Design a protein with these regions (language model features):
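Helix-loop-helix hairpins in multi-pass membrane proteins, especially solute transporters
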Residues: 61-155
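Helix-boundary and loop/linker segments of multi-pass membrane transporters
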Residues: 1-7, 92-93
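Generic detection of intrinsically disordered/low-complexity segments and helix-coil linkers/edges
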Residues: 2-5, 13, 42, 47, ...
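Extracytoplasmic
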Residues: 6-64
């Protein structure tokens, strides 16, 4: 039996990962104009920064179940977190539009792998009598992330 404190701590960390992945979508959407000016990206190419990320994320979400079965929930989530973090650093270091679009696709793949494990963990780790609370927390985190993005993009 796992310690309830460790289970909730792990669940909270997973919620934070999901929050950042969802937040990233909205923050970048808010900053697209500034990104385009900074990197001298044409308007028709600028949309690919978001499109590449979102397409990769949508592809990664259903693959997460397969990856979880192959590598376990813990290791898949850790790998996704490390990959997302490294891709985020890569995005910050990009000096061209093509490089940014490419790294955003990679970031989207890892970002997509940060969302489903939160809800999977509710049914695997959380005791049945606490699953409603955990699902509510996860849903609230998923809803608060895009809402809070506008103010964090301004920073």
């Amino acid at each position: 039996m796992k310690s309830p404190v460790l289970v909730w701590l792990g669940f909270s960390a997973m919620c934070l990962g999901m929050f950042v992945a969802i937040l990233d979508i909205q923050v970048v959407a808010s900053a697209l104009t500034n990104i385009g000016v900074s990197l001298d990206i044409a308007d028709d190419s600028l949309s690919w920064i978001q499109t590449g990320y979102l397409t990769a994320e949508v592809i990664a979400i259903p693959l997460t179940g397969l990856l979880t079965r192959a590598f376990t929930l813990r290791w898949m989530f850790v790998a996704a977190t490390v990959g997302f973090t490294l891709a985020s650093v890569g995005c910050a270091l990009c000096d061209s539009g093509a490089a940014l679009i490419t790294i955003r696709v990679v970031q989207g793949l890892f970002g997509g792998m940060l969302i489903p494990p939160v809800f999977t963990s509710v049914f695997i780790l959380i005791p049945k009598e606490r699953q409603l609370i955990a699902t509510t927390v996860a849903g609230a985190v998923a809803m608060i992330a895009p809402w809070s993005a506008r103010s964090s993009a301004a920073i």
